[in-house]
């Protein structure tokens, strides 16, 4: 299935139903009074996270999603039915953004999390609400309010503990294959990886972490060169970044310069992302001798002013890979993910209906019936006719 990590859709909540102007007309009950019911509330639009989905391809072609409109009120004090809600299933890790205001509505980071993205309109009031001691036959009502309508940008951001950075052909996909059961495509040409992929690295029987591989970056990626930087968003939720460097590039480029290019592109994309913990890992040491690799790595680290530790591995042969994964696992366990306490069930906000009704009644709509009277006529289905006789 094709990997789609962005989708722009239109969500429309249902409008509230209008109130009804009606009067009770029944045999033996003269002047029965108002009995117009309220309308129904409009339906809402929700997003829910589903761990069984891994792409937004379902929203690539179908762009508009509308909830049901609330029914209008009816006579006999009957309230209209509420409009039907709709729930859209999206992958875990999806972020919802209002495309007009760029407001982040929320992130769905756990399976089953549910988020309201468009609120339905409130119901209108029937003429029964306007009955009073001085207004026995009210002909006022209110209409329902419109539901929310939004252009919603959905962004899928992979949830991983470790993110891989590097130029094309640095060996990122080979590393994923070495530490996990994932089998991303590996070849001897640039941009073999075209879409992000995930792998689960197991360290022992009950210890594991998730690693994300994204397409390689090149100089000018921030300006759209290569595959651009659109996939860097998948690293925003990682706890540590692994910067994989080819210690002896086949194109004879300078590894120190290559490191600077990646750091520059990362900073241009997001200053916050560039401040994440980053480990420097030199790959393909099997292509040169171990002593030469040590000396070359030391020289590169001095050129870029690297003050932290660095690793030398060969993802192709597995040399030193186990030590690296063990240290990554220890770091992840020592630095648990900082997640704000989120209620999986959204706090229910109780709408102040009394205040809404009071405000709505200040600006009612008055029905003007040219031939309105409360007396019975032959056109009425049923009722009581008053016959006055002179005694």
UniProtKB/Swiss-Prot annotation:
- Family assignment from sequence similarity: Belongs to the TRAFAC class OBG-HflX-like GTPase superfamily. OBG GTPase family.
Enzyme class name? hydrolase
Gene Ontology MF, one = GTP binding
Tell me which cofactor or cofactors this protein depends on: Mg(2+)
Q: How does it assemble?
A: Monomer.
**Summary of the function given for this chain in its UniProt record:** An essential GTPase which binds GTP, GDP and possibly (p)ppGpp with moderate affinity, with high nucleotide exchange rates and a fairly low GTP hydrolysis rate. Plays a role in control of the cell cycle, stress response, ribosome biogenesis and in those bacteria that undergo differentiation, in morphogenesis control.
* PROSITE patterns reported in the protein's UniProt record: G_OBG, GTP1_OBG, OBG
Q: What's the superkingdom here?
A: Bacteria
Where is it localised? Cytoplasm
Gene encoding this chain?
obg
Query: What's the name of the protein?
Result: GTPase Obg
Q: Which residues form the OBG-type G domain?
A: 160-333
> Which source organism does the UniProt entry give?
Actinobacillus pleuropneumoniae serotype 3 (strain JL03)
| Keyword terms | Cytoplasm, GTP-binding, Hydrolase, Magnesium, Metal-binding, Nucleotide-binding
CDD domains registered for this protein in UniProt? Obg (cd01898)
Query: What does the record give as the organism's lineage?
Result: Bacteria, Pseudomonadati, Pseudomonadota, Gammaproteobacteria, Pasteurellales
Major subcellular site: cytoplasm
Domain named Obg is located at: 1-159
């Amino acid at each position: 299935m094709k990997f789609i990590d962005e989708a722009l859709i239109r969500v429309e909540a249902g409008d509230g139903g209008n109130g009804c102007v009606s009067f009770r007309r029944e045999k033996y009950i003269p002047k029965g009074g108002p009995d117009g019911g309220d309308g129904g509330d409009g339906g809402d639009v929700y997003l829910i996270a589903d761990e069984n989905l891994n792409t937004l391809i379902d929203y690539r072609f179908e762009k508009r999603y509308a909830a049901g409109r609330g029914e209008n009120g009816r006579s006999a004090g009957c309230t209209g039915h509420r409009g039907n809600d709709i729930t859209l299933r999206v992958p875990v890790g999806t972020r919802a953004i209002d495309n007009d205001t760029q407001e982040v509505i929320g992130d769905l980071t756990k399976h089953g999390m549910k988020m309201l993205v468009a609120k339905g309109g409130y119901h209108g009031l029937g003429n029964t609400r306007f009955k009073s001691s001085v207004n026995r036959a009210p002909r006022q009502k209110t209409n329902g309010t419109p539901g929310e309508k939004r252009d919603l940008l959905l962004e899928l951001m992979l949830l991983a503990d470790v993110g891989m950075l590097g130029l094309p052909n640095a060996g990122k996909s080979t590393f994923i294959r070495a530490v996990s059961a994932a089998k991303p495509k590996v070849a001897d040409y640039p941009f073999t990886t075209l879409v992000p992929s995930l792998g689960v690295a197991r360290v022992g029987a009950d210890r594991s972490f998730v690693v994300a591989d994204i397409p390689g970056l090149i100089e000018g990626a921030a300006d759209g060169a290569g595959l651009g930087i659109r996939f860097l968003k998948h690293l925003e939720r990682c706890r540590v970044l692994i910067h994989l460097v080819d210690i002896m590039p086949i194109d004879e480029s300078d590894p120190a310069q290559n490191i600077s290019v990646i750091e520059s592109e990362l900073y241009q994309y997001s200053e916050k992302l560039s401040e994440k913990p980053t480990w420097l890992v030199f790959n393909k040491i099997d292509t040169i001798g171990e002593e030469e690799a040590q000396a070359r790595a030391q020289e590169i680290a001095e050129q870029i002013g690297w003050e932290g530790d660095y690793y030398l591995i060969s993802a192709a042969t597995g040399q030193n890979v186990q030590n690296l994964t063990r240290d990554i696992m220890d770091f992840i366990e020592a630095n648990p993910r900082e997640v704000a306490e989120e209620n999986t069930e959204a706090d229910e906000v109780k709408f102040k209906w009394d205040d809404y009704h009071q405000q709505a009644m200040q600006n009612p709509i008055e029905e003007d019936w040219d031939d309105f009277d409360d007396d019975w006529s032959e056109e009425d289905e049923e009722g009581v006719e008053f016959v006055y006789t002179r005694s």
